[in-house]
Amino acid sequence: MTTYIKAARLIDCTGAQPMLAPVIVVDGEYITRIADAASIEIPLDANVIDCGQDTLMAGLIDSHIHVGEDARRDESVKQQHLQPDGLRAIRGAVTLKDDLMCGVTSARALGDGTGCVDVILRDAINRGEITGPRLQVAAQAIRPSNGTAPEIGVVADGEDEMRKAVRRAIFNGADVIKLFISNVSRGETYLDYLKGDLTQVSAYTKRELEVAVEEAHRCGIKVAGHCIGGDVVKWALEAGLASLEHANLIEEDDIPYFKKYGGYISDPNLILFFDPVRGFESPTIKTHKWNQLPHW
């Protein structure tokens, strides 16, 4: 069936000026034509979706999410991750639908505990049982025994354990491997994290990183690393990690390594701030009156 989608304007995300009065022609699951309304004839009996004064654009890609987290909830991030897997799966289904309704059509889930909740939700979306964006998932994030985020990942110390952990994550359904490669923890609370964690100390040796990448690449899977800064930035890029998550404390002399080895930075915390009691928080987004924002 052919569907015609009309709107006030279209942003094609190429840098071009918005197209006014666009019409998108969809045949089945594929967009076959985009044109302005004056240059296209819509059959009288056609299936038309008229978006009025709204703006159309390509789907957004969120490169770093945790399906068990929801900034609108009163619990801290850590408390949410410690909830039973069943509850986190239900909540995740709700937030993923909200993500899609906000325009996120693809997302990368980088660690949701040891129960593979992200795998379950990805597969349910793919089967059409729940509504949400297409997901790439890490299944089980990997961290050292003295690393950060104990509620998110499984422990692997040394080259042999690293290799086994990567294999296990792939067996459990991982599309991407997530490593916590910086932050050596000095405590269990967010206050410890804020005041005591060694954010620029490598959590793994360079050889451990190389082993993880070797094992992942054998299966055609890329590796992402939670990395704040320090020597591990260069180690990770040399080892072949595809992305560094956060990278808040990188230095100027790290930049050539990104250019040479082709890695990129994915920073999901652009709207987060850190509270010494509750941990990571978002601004009071619940107070925004989204329905009163002007069309753009």
Please tell me what each predicted stretch does:
Residues T2-T3, L10-M57, K78-Q79:
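Histidine-rich, glycine-flanked metal-binding segment
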Residues N146-E210:
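Active-site gating/metal-coordination segments in enzymes
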